[in-house]
C-alpha cells in the first residue's frame, strides 16, 4: 500500500511539482497552501507523513508543528527549509519534527523519510 502524504507550502508552483513527483513515486498526495488549511485536512484525514515548508506567511512551520503535534501526536512531520540556521532546525526536531530537509529536497532522501514515517506510523497502530 502506498504512503499517504500531505504537502504544505505557500508556493503553489513548488507544491504542484512536489505533488507530481511524489505521485510518480506511487504515493497518494494531498496538498494545502497554508497551515490553517492543512490543519483542517489533518483533522479529517489520516496521513503517513506531512511534508511542510518551515517558512510560510500567517502561521509559520514552528507554530504549525506545535499545533499539528498537539492535535495528532503520532503525526510524522518532515520540514523543508531554505536558509535556516542549524539551531532552528534543532529546535524543530525538539518540537517533534521527524526531520528537517534543505530545499531543494533530494527526492530519494525525501522518499526514504516518507517510507520511514509510514513504517513508524504502522508500528504505532
Where are the language model's segments positioned?
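Short amphipathic alpha-helix used as the core "switch/output" element in two-component signaling
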Residues: 40, 62-74
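Receiver (REC) domain active-site loop signature in two-component systems and cognate sites
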Residues: 56
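Active-site beta3 strand of CheY-like receiver
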Residues: 45-51
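Helix N-cap/capping motif at the beta->alpha junctions
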Residues: 31-40, 61
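C-terminal output helix
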Residues: 87, 105-115
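Alpha4 helix (beta4-alpha4-beta5 surface) of REC/receiver domains from two-component response regulators
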Residues: 63, 84-99
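Two-component/phosphorelay signaling modules centered on CheY-like receiver
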Residues: 12-30
Amino acid at each position: 500500500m502506498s504512503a499517504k502524504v500531505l504537502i504544505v507550502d505557500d508556493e503553489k508552483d513548488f507544491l504542484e511539482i512536489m505533488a507530481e513527483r511524489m505521485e510518480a513515486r506511487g504515493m497518494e498526495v494531498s496538498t494545502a497552501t497554508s497551515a490553517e488549511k492543512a490543519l483542517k485536512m489533518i483533522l479529517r484525514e489520516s496521513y503517513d507523513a506531512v511534508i511542510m515548508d518551515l517558512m510560510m506567511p500567517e502561521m509559520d512551520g514552528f507554530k504549525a508543528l506545535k499545533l499539528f503535534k498537539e492535535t495528532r501526536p503520532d503525526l510524522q512531520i518532515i520540514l523543508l527549509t531554505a536558509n535556516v540556521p542549524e539551531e532552528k532546525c534543532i529546535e524543530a526536531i525538539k518540537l517533534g519534527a521527524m526531520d528537517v530537509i534543505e530545499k531543494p529536497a533530494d527526492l530519494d532522501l525525501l522518499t526514504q523519510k516518507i517510507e520511514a514515517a509510514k513504517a513508524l506510523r504502522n508500528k504505532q497502530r
